[in-house]
């Protein structure tokens, strides 16, 4: 995977390696949801935008033939344990799974964060 930036937008480029790649799947985690609104501003609510982004990513990855699941596909509340449970229910404790958690941070963030669990 390659991460690049242009005009304060992060681009994630995934390289598909054919049979040599042992990737079991990708799990897309739409940050917040339900009673947890996340950040908001200019009429945009984080939980709605992260779900929209995750649905777009889901469609694109599915079109590429990559096994993909979402922690939520509607406006529901999930605590962190629920999110982990979704991954484990689908893929077990495999290290061959990529989990992408989408968030739109407010406040003092510089607009680009990459973290790991």
PLM feature segments, named:
Residues 1-20:
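Short, Lys/Arg-enriched N-terminal segments with co-localized hydrophobic residues
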Residues 17-117:
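Catalytic-core regions of hydrolytic enzymes
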């Amino acid at each position: 995977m390659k991460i690049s930036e242009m005009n304060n937008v992060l681009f994630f480029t995934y390289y598909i390696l054919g049979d040599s790649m042992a990737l079991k799947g990708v799990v897309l985690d739409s940050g917040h949801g339900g009673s947890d609104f996340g950040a908001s501003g200019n009429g945009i609510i984080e939980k709605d935008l992260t779900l929209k982004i995750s649905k777009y990513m889901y469609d694109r990855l599915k079109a590429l033939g990559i096994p993909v699941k979402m922690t939520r596909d509607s406006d529901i509340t999930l605590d962190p344990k629920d999110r982990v449970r979704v991954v484990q229910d689908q893929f077990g404790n495999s290290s061959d799974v990529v989990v992408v958690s989408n968030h739109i941070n407010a406040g003092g963030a510089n607009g680009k964060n990459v973290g790991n669990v």
